[in-house]
Amino acid sequence: MGDPAERSQIRDELPTLRFDTPGEWERWLESWHERSSGVWLALAKRGTGVTGLTYAEALDGAICFGWIDGQKAALDERFWLQRFTPRRPRSRWSQINRARADELAGAGRMRAAGAAQVERAKLDGRWEAAYAGQRTAAVPEDLTAGLAANPAAQEFFATLDSANRYAILYRIHEAKRPPTRARRIERYVAMLAARETIHP
C-alpha cells in the first residue's frame, strides 16, 4: 500500500489505508510496525456488498505485531474507520484481546513484537489485571453491596444503558488500591442515587 506518509491525512494526522486481505495488512505491519505511529483503516460496512479486510482480521494482525485498536470514526456510506496504533508501554489489556493473543500464539501467528508485548504485560502484572469487555463485565460484589444499601441507587443502576453501566464497572476495576476502589464505589453510589450518569 506504500509509504503511509503519502496517504491522505485526517483527524490526528495518521494516514488512512485500506486493505483487501489480512495478508496485505500483515505485510504492511511487517514493514511499518516499528516506524509508524499508527493508521486509520477503512473497513467495509456490513450490507454494502463491499469486500475486504474485516475488523476481526485487522485486530488479529495488529495483536500479532504489538499494535492495538482505538477509536472508531465515520467515513462514508461504504466504509468506516478504525484507528490502530502501537501498544503503549503501560497500555491495559482487555480479557478479549488477551484470549486472542493466546489463540494467535497457539496457532504460530504471533510475531516477535507481539510476543514481546505479551511478555512485558505478564512481567508487570497487566496480563493478570486484564479487564472484562462491555458484553461480559460483571457487577463486583463490593459494588453490589453498596447498591443494596442504597435502594435509590440500585433502582437507577438497573435502568442504565450499556455504555453508562460499563463506564462505572471499568472505573471501579481500574482502581489499584482498596481505599481508592472503596471511594469510587461510594462516589458512584451517590451519583446513581442522584440519578446522574457518567455519559449524557
What are these regions (language model features)?
Residues M1-P200:
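Charge-dense, helix-prone N-terminal extensions
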